[in-house]
Amino acid sequence: EPFITTNVEGTFHLLEAARKHDVRFHHISTDEVYGDLALDDPHKFTESTPYKPSSPYSASKAASDQLVRAWIRTYGLRATISNCSNNYGPYQHVEKFIPRQITSIMEGVRPKLYGTGENVRDWIHTEDHSSAVWEILTRGRIGETYLIGADGEKNNITVLRMILKMMGQDEN
C-alpha cells in the first residue's frame, strides 16, 4: 500500500498542483518498469520498450508514468519523464542494497544476498543521475521520456564482491 500511496496518489497530487500553477513538471521513475534482462541479453531497454513490471513497486511506478503521460495528452501539461537505473551514493537509505552490504560488513555481520545474487541491475552514481536530470530540465523536449543509465550492469553477487574487496574483506 505505501507504494500506491506515494507513487500513484502522490503523483496525481503533484500533477494537479503543476497543472493548477502552470509549471513544468519532471517525473523521475525507474527502469524497473521494463522488467528484467539477463546479464548476457544483447537487447537493451529503450524508451519504446513495453512495460513489464514485476513487483508491486515497479507496477506503481509504471502507473505513475502513465498518469504523467495522460496529463500531458489531456491537459497539455509541460512534463518530461525519466526512467533511471539503480542509484548509489552518499547518504543513501541503509535499506538499499549497497549501503546495507557496507553497514553489515562494518558491523561484523555477514552480508546477505537474496536468491542467487544473479539478478542484474545497472548502477549509476547519484551525481551522474542529477546531471542527467538537469540536462532533461534544461534541454529536454516536453512530452518525451528519457532513459538514464551508466552502462554499469552488474549482478548483485559481483557488486557484493567489489564491496568486500574495497573494504579489505575476504569474499568467503
Where are these regions (language model features)?
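Conserved active-site helix of classical SDR/Rossmann-fold NAD(P)-dependent CH-OH oxidoreductases
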Residues: 11-12, 62-69, 73, 99-102, ...
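C-terminal substrate-binding subdomain of Rossmann-fold SDR/epimerase-dehydratase oxidoreductases
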Residues: 105-172
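Conserved Rossmann-fold NAD(P)-dependent oxidoreductase catalytic core, especially the SDR/UDP-sugar
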Residues: 12-55
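Hydrophobic structural elements of the Rossmann-like NAD(P)H-binding subdomain
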Residues: 26-28, 82, 101
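Flexible, glycine-rich beta-alpha linker
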Residues: 34-35, 52-56, 80-97
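Active-site Tyr-X1-5-Lys
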Residues: 36, 52-80, 105-107
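A hydrophobic alpha-helix adjacent to the NAD(P)-binding/active-site core of NAD(P)-dependent oxidoreductases
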Residues: 3-4
